[in-house]
């Protein structure tokens, strides 16, 4: 058994030093690995999901962003300590599983965006905003992002689930519900994913 290091962080150059929860799959004759990458620690902003690919498991491509750091509107938030959250709060990524290979051959990546009012509050406490998906194409580029599930139990729906760019202008991002994709096979793959409760935890 051999162990290969995929990434080495360096705090002195401002790199993201919290790299956690690797998820590995094989797709189209390459390995695909995703993980949570954060500036400093778990449940802290900014953080994002990144991914990399490898032909042999030894040499890996430079990581790319799979699900970016964003802000989310907190008007719908019904969880504790709402007073600690600004109206546009950091949306903290979380997953137990990232990749789903659908029966039609599509590789779907997924993550959940929640909130951490303080460093002790996990974003998967039931009061997050939504689960997002996007397709990983056979050339390892990505589709647009879509919402696959609003967290209605946490107070979020199609009207109040709004994501924003964190860069300066806080521009509202267009992330539609998955059924509005023009790719019908992608929609079928998402429908199938919604039946797999373990992946959606």
Please report, for each region that a protein language model flagged, where it lies by residue.
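Beta-rich carbohydrate-recognition and catalytic domains
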Residues: 1-17, 26-92, 101-201
């Amino acid at each position: 058994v051999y162990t290969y290091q995929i990434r080495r962080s360096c705090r002195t150059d401002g790199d993201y030093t919290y790299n956690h929860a690797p998820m590995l799959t094989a797709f189209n004759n390459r390995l695909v690995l995703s993980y949570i990458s954060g500036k400093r620690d778990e449940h802290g902003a900014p953080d994002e999901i990144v991914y990399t690919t490898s032909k042999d498991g030894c040499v890996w491509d430079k990581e790319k962003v799979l699900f970016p750091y964003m802000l989310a509107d907190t008007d719908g938030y019904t969880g504790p300590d709402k007073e600690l959250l600004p109206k546009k709060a950091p949306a903290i990524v979380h997953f137990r599983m990232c990749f789903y290979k659908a029966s039609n051959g599509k590789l779907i990546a997924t993550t959940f965006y929640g909130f951490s009012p303080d460093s002790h509050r996990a974003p998967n406490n039931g009061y997050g905003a939504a689960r997002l998906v996007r397709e990983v194409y056979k050339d390892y580029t990505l589709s647009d992002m879509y919402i696959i599930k609003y967290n209605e139990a946490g107070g979020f729906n199609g009207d109040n689930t709004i994501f924003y760019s964190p860069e300066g202008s806080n521009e509202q991002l267009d992330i539609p519900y998955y059924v509005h994709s023009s790719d019908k096979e992608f929609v079928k793959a998402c429908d199938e994913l919604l039946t797999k409760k373990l992946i959606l935890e």
